[in-house]
Amino acid sequence: TWFGKKEVFEQLEGYRQMPLCEDYDFTLRAILKGYKISNLNEVVLKYRMTSDSISRSNLFEQYLYGCYITKQYSKKQIASIEDAHNYVKEHNNSKNAKKYLKANKYFNDALNDIENKSFISFIKNGLLLLFASKYYLNKIYRFVMVTLYS
């Protein structure tokens, strides 16, 4: 859910058809245009994930699109939709997608273990996560870096 000035949406010409990453693409384009983006420190929307959710069924593909968009952003460039599609097509395969999805399960299980104070299970899921997918570890690393430097 977004709150923003109409002029921001107009100048950016709204959302683009960037598969699986429309919000992320919009946010980085806004930053490149000099707008400030921020999060509220309170929950205003609860989102329920289901196994059929597009965010889950295409999780690795979404990660790849995000990587490409970020790579272009780090060069202070707006990602081309066509180039992003070609990048994903080149790097996506079912073996890595399955590993990534499995790593996501271990990660979420580990988070639940912390919440439930199941520390032995947390260690087990954490260790399994370490060896499940190098791409998922990269996602965690990127998240930590953004959190530290934001």
Regions found by a protein language model. Name each.
Residues 1-67:
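Conserved nucleotide-sugar donor-binding catalytic segment
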